[in-house]
Swiss-Prot record:
Name of protein: Universal stress protein B
GO cellular component terms, A-Z: plasma membrane
UniProt xrefs under Pfam families: UspB (PF10625)
Organism: Yersinia pestis
Membrane topology, from the record: Multi-pass membrane protein
Keywords in alphabetical order: Cell inner membrane, Cell membrane, Membrane, Transmembrane, Transmembrane helix
Family the entry assigns: Belongs to the universal stress protein B family.
Transmembrane regions: 1-21, 90-110
Length: 111
């Protein structure tokens, strides 16, 4: 029989891999954004997005922009496709992180 602890760690690994995919897709989106919409790139602080002096309020703007699907009116189909992919990965990663937390609580109660 499969150990519940091993199953929990496998779930954690899947969650971390999906976080890495999300991070990579976000970096690729910012590269596309720099070329197709420089004003939006500046609006979300694309140049300083992943630096230590990045502005969290501008980072949250980009997440809100994608989550509210405001990108659907954009003129560049490549940008729309990448935003759709990123939105799906964000929802998947959020659900997996929630599942990890629920699993951790269940393991704490179980043992």
């Amino acid at each position: 029989m499969i150990s519940t602890v091993a199953l929990f760690w496998a779930l954690c690994v899947v969650c971390v891999v999906n976080m890495a995919r999300y991070y990579s897709s976000l970096r690729a989106l910012l590269v596309v954004l720099r070329g197709c919409d420089p004003l939006l790139y500046q609006y979300v602080d694309g140049g300083g997005f992943f630096t230590s002096h990045g502005q969290p309020s501008k980072q949250i703007r980009l997440v809100g922009y994608i989550f509210a699907q405001r990108y659907l009116d954009h003129h560049d189909p490549e940008f729309i496709r990448r935003c759709e992919r990123l939105r799906g990965q964000f929802i998947l990663t959020s659900a997996l992180c929630g599942l990890v937390v629920v699993s951790l609580v269940a393991l704490m109660l179980w043992y």
